[in-house]
Amino acid sequence: MPEVKSMFREVLPKQGQLSMEDVPTMVLCKPKLLPLKSVTLEKLEKMQKDAQEIIRQQELALKEQPPSEKAE
């Protein structure tokens, strides 16, 4: 691979300390998968669905009863 010439020439000191500036770089982390629905929300939805099913069954039971039993 051919080296690219830059307009700045590297200078290393013969004596003294050599310091280098640390440049922060981006570090890509593994993505975290988050659930679309929380466990609590799923439990609440299940409870609501069960309650609606019970109400629907009770309404069907009332419709199937003969009229004489409804009057009591």
From Swiss-Prot:
Q: Which UniProt keywords apply?
A: Cell projection, Cilium, Cytoplasm
Provide the protein's localization: Cell projection, Cilium; Cytoplasm
Q: What is this protein called?
A: BBSome-interacting protein 1
Q: Which domain of life is it from?
A: Eukaryota
Additional remark text: BBIP10 interacts genetically with BBS1.
**Record family assignment:** Belongs to the BBIP10 family.
Function comment: Required for primary cilia assembly.
- Name the lineage: Eukaryota, Metazoa, Chordata, Craniata, Vertebrata
Describe the inactivation phenotype: Embryos display defective melanosome transport and disruption of the ciliated Kupffer's vesicle phenotypes. BBIP1 morpholino knockdown results in bilateral cystic dilations of the pronephros. Pronephric cilia of morphants are abnormally short and fail to maintain a parallel orientation to the anteroposterior axis of the duct. Morphants also show increased frequency of situs inversus compared to wild-type and abnormal retinal development.
GO cellular component terms, semicolon-separated = BBSome; cytoplasm
A Gene Ontology BP annotation from the UniProt entry: receptor localization to non-motile cilium
Query: What gene is it encoded by?
Result: bbip1
Q: InterPro entries, per this entry?
A: BBIP10
